[in-house]
């Protein structure tokens, strides 16, 4: 499972011209589910993102998390994060989870975030969406749940 996490001053998502999710200051999370991902991957990323210290304290240091500040989160499914571009010029999405499996884990991720007290707005799984993201900083971090299996050097 991969996530692109962006600190935002505000963000919104529209489907067919209608706003279906919007937040003020917080995090916009683009979430991609890969074949073989499990609830453990969702648990890892939910905890990591909610507690990631990428908000500045009074001294300007990254010491505060979304949870510390009770900020909001916008979560949008994005299977294109699982693209394999190693061969040729057209991305392959063969490693992306099947839609039913991906939708289930996407919803597990959202539920876990909400259970931690985070206000979560969402896009619509599988829909064509228009995102408006006001990146604050900019601060953008890429996370992969499989990284937890690799020891840090």
Swiss-Prot record:
Catalysed reaction, written as an equation: glycyl-tRNA(Ala) + H2O = tRNA(Ala) + glycine + H(+); a D-aminoacyl-tRNA + H2O = a tRNA + a D-alpha-amino acid + H(+)
Location(s) in or outside the cell: Cytoplasm
Entry keyword set: Cytoplasm, Hydrolase, RNA-binding, tRNA-binding
Subunit structure: Homodimer.
InterPro entries per UniProt: Daa-tRNA_deacyls_DTD, DTD-like_sf
Species: Dehalococcoides mccartyi (strain ATCC BAA-2100 / JCM 16839 / KCTC 5957 / BAV1)
HAMAP family: Deacylase_Dtd
Notes on the domains: A Gly-cisPro motif from one monomer fits into the active site of the other monomer to allow specific chiral rejection of L-amino acids.
Stated role: An aminoacyl-tRNA editing enzyme that deacylates mischarged D-aminoacyl-tRNAs. Also deacylates mischarged glycyl-tRNA(Ala), protecting cells against glycine mischarging by AlaRS. Acts via tRNA-based rather than protein-based catalysis; rejects L-amino acids rather than detecting D-amino acids in the active site. By recycling D-aminoacyl-tRNA to D-amino acids and free tRNA molecules, this enzyme counteracts the toxicity associated with the formation of D-aminoacyl-tRNA entities in vivo and helps enforce protein L-homochirality.
The enzyme's E.C. designation: 3.1.1.96
Gene Ontology CC terms: cytoplasm
Annotated GO biological process: D-amino acid catabolic process
Entry protein name: D-aminoacyl-tRNA deacylase
